[in-house]
């Protein structure tokens, strides 16, 4: 059946989120377990989409009173216009409406001029208000007007210059992406007794316009939407009530293999040597029978009793008609209940 192609792949659990002092800007997102190779596949795809395809806002042009072109200088302003433009490129902006929009800055020296002094409309936020734009000497003043727009990716300055641009308008390279940095790494992780699975660790930093967790969610949604066109078959129909899973005469947890329990190597090897494969095999053993197992001591016995107790089980239980026929097929069918 075609659905086995995806249904039989292991699915990761809900991602673990680790944040620092500022959860709105930095986070580490961990997804495990993944099939071997899927860590790199998903990590690389998410990284590329995060850096290139998320919508954001940026300054696209500026006008400074008394400045005709970007190679000018302003009296009483310590930075030249080129440096001011470089500082403006680093403004972090959030827009709650479609652009373009205008912002204005008026400042008088002496002192440092920061992004927090910019006058913005109600639908624009400056996310790094302490960012320095320029420094004014005593008696100096400056007035700037900024054009802000929304978009994605990187747009060079020449694309931001309108054909009817007035004299003195300086187009700016726009980096719209709210994501500043993405790094990922893949480590081996355990599933049962096997280490042949991937753990994906994503480290995401944004400018605050979107949280790292939301950014990853949006990137995943973009990938989902783009990949949808390649699904050219109809999904198998859901099973009818007559085809539904039969009721088991015992706890489905008994179908779980003992090598998936978090046991010490010594205990796991003793069970393996005694041909105990499923939990259903294990719980029918008495304590005396277990202690007769070669190399199996009281410490291993207590460990197993503690693990079983956590599942509501114990040694010496009676399970009629065990083992069932086609036990491996039953284990797959009731995998979600194990």
Curated annotation (Swiss-Prot):
Keywords linked to the UniProt accession: DNA-directed RNA polymerase, Nucleotidyltransferase, Transcription, Transferase
GO terms classed as biological process: DNA-templated transcription
This protein's GO CC annotations: cytoplasm; DNA-directed RNA polymerase complex
CDD domains named among the record's database cross-references: RNAP_alpha_NTD
Top EC group: transferase
Reaction catalysed by this enzyme: RNA(n) + a ribonucleoside 5'-triphosphate = RNA(n+1) + diphosphate
Highest taxon in the source lineage: Bacteria
Chain segments carrying region Alpha N-terminal domain (alpha-NTD): 1-234
Pfam family, one: RNA_pol_A_CTD
E.C. numbers: 2.7.7.6
UniProt-listed Gene3D superfamilies: 5' to 3' exonuclease, C-terminal subdomain, DNA-directed RNA polymerase, insert domain, RNA polymerase, RBP11-like subunit
GO molecular function term, any single one: DNA-directed RNA polymerase activity
SMART domains: RPOLD
Region (Alpha C-terminal domain (alpha-CTD)) location: 250-338
Subunit organization: Homodimer. The RNAP catalytic core consists of 2 alpha, 1 beta, 1 beta' and 1 omega subunit. When a sigma factor is associated with the core the holoenzyme is formed, which can initiate transcription.
Function according to Swiss-Prot or TrEMBL: DNA-dependent RNA polymerase catalyzes the transcription of DNA into RNA using the four ribonucleoside triphosphates as substrates.
Similarity comment: family membership: Belongs to the RNA polymerase alpha chain family.
Domain notes: The N-terminal domain is essential for RNAP assembly and basal transcription, whereas the C-terminal domain is involved in interaction with transcriptional regulators and with upstream promoter elements.
The protein's name in its UniProt record: DNA-directed RNA polymerase subunit alpha
Organism: Caulobacter sp. (strain K31)
Gene symbol of the encoding locus: rpoA
